[in-house]
Structures are given as structure tokens and as C-alpha cells.
Swiss-Prot record:
Gene3D superfamilies: Histone, subunit A. This is Inner kinetochore subunit MHF2. GO terms for biological process: DNA damage response; DNA repair; kinetochore assembly; replication fork processing; resolution of meiotic recombination intermediates. The gene is MHF2. It comes from Saccharomyces cerevisiae (strain ATCC 204508 / S288c) (Baker's yeast). One of its GO terms (molecular function) is DNA binding. Pfam families: CENP-X.
């Protein structure tokens, strides 16, 4: 999970971010949303990788690349 401090720093880097006030109850909701988004991105990237490259018979670790994420990110953003 992204730390509260890191999340606040990221949110405050937008235009006019110095004047932005973030309510304490909002941060856990944003953290949860980001956790769900990241989990979904990983699962979709994994499925896309398997669809393109086929199932592997061995049990060696699977390595995802930025290309796997690029294939799914457009639809993922629309779905979220």
C-alpha cells in the first residue's frame, strides 16, 4: 500500500497543489482504490501475456514487461 505521506505528496504536485487540503478520511479511500487498480492491472497483464505467449508447462517465474501493461492499460482505465 502506498504510504499516506507519499500519496499526499503525489496529489499535491498538481497545479495549485500547495493550496490543496486533503481530508484525513479521503486518504484511506484513495489508497484502497490504488490497491484495487494495481491488482487489476497485474491480473490483466498476466492474462494478456498468457494469451499472447501461450501457457507455459514449466513452473519457472513469469516475467511481465511494460508491453504487457501497455496492451491492457487503455481498457483498464476505461473500466475503472
Amino acid at each position: 500500500m502506498l504510504s499516506k505521506e507519499a500519496l499526499i505528496k503525489i496529489l499535491s504536485q498538481n497545479e495549485g497543489g500547495n493550496d490543496m487540503k486533503i481530508a484525513d478520511e479521503v486518504v484511506p479511500m484513495i489508497q484502497k482504490y490504488l490497491d484495487i487498480f494495481i491488482d487489476e492491472a497485474v491480473l490483466r497483464s498476466l492474462q494478456s501475456h498468457k494469451d499472447i505467449n501461450g501457457e507455459r508447462g514449466d513452473k519457472s517465474p513469469l516475467e511481465l514487461s511494460h508491453q504487457d501493461l501497455e496492451r491492457i492499460v487503455g481498457l483498464l482505465l476505461m473500466d475503472m
